[in-house]
Amino acid sequence: MSSRQPLLDALGVELPDELLSLALTHRSYAYEHGGLPTNERLEFLGDAVLGLTITDALYHRHPDRTEGDLAKLRASVVNTQALADVARKLCDGGLGAHLLLGRGEANTGGADKSSILADGMESLLGAIYLQHGIDTAREVILRLFGALLDAAPTLGAGLDWKTSLQELTAARGMGAPSYLVTSTGPDHDKEFTAVVVVADTEYGTGVGRSKKEAEQKAAAATWKALDVLDSAAQTSA
């Protein structure tokens, strides 16, 4: 069995070796190997296919939602962090284990960088669309992103959890959130931990390969924690 077969099994489709390799080729690898084609064109295509599929699904699931509400729901599903999370769970080792990265990128944790994983996920979706058409691509997307679609009404503006959290705390008169960030590890392999403080109280914590990723995860955890507290208060009222 091909070492990439578990990835194809997780996607639920077959792809020609040449097309699959292209979808997995990051620009850092292409540069180190004499300027090979990269997955960026497929990423561009996959982004459009993903956006259309999710938009169509939300439009039909929520007939009473306004355009603005639908845009927020889509942002909670189609964003770098959500794509990266899907990529990490795609198969044993995640998508990162199959990406073709340059040595420099690989040595700095590129296989787990959210931006690279998100781009790779979109590239695969673009490849599926090219090989199998929109119907199959749609089936794959709805299966992989189904849980996110179901949870979209409770997720907040996942495109930018920090902004979403700031809007929530402002609406509740809690003041602006602040972030306490620490890091561990050598310069080439740092891990960042962020803790959100709102009204002198520590809430969510997030860990990531970059300060931005850690803060976004911490903001997401805090948003959800505050939402749970609000729901509990309404239930007991």
Swiss-Prot record:
Subcellular location: Cytoplasm
Pfam families, per database record: dsrm, Ribonucleas_3_3
E.C. number(s) listed in UniProt: 3.1.26.3
Gene Ontology CC terms, in alphabetical order: cytoplasm
Gene Ontology molecular function: any one: double-stranded RNA binding
Keyword Hydrolase: yes
Binding positions (Mg(2+)): 43, 119, 122
CDD domains listed in its UniProt record: DSRM_RNAse_III_family, RIBOc
Active site: 47, 122
Gene3D superfamilies listed in its UniProt record: 3.30.160.20, Ribonuclease III domain
Catalytically driven reaction(s): Endonucleolytic cleavage to 5'-phosphomonoester
Class in the EC hierarchy, top level: hydrolase
PANTHER family in the record: RIBONUCLEASE 3 (PTHR11207:SF0), RIBONUCLEASE III (PTHR11207)
Family stated for the protein in its record: Belongs to the ribonuclease III family.
Assembly information from the UniProt record: Homodimer.
Biological role stated in the UniProt entry: Digests double-stranded RNA. Involved in the processing of primary rRNA transcript to yield the immediate precursors to the large and small rRNAs (23S and 16S). Processes some mRNAs, and tRNAs when they are encoded in the rRNA operon. Processes pre-crRNA and tracrRNA of type II CRISPR loci if present in the organism.
Protein name: Ribonuclease 3
Organism from which the protein derives: Mycolicibacterium paratuberculosis (strain ATCC BAA-968 / K-10) (Mycobacterium paratuberculosis)
Gene this protein is translated from: rnc
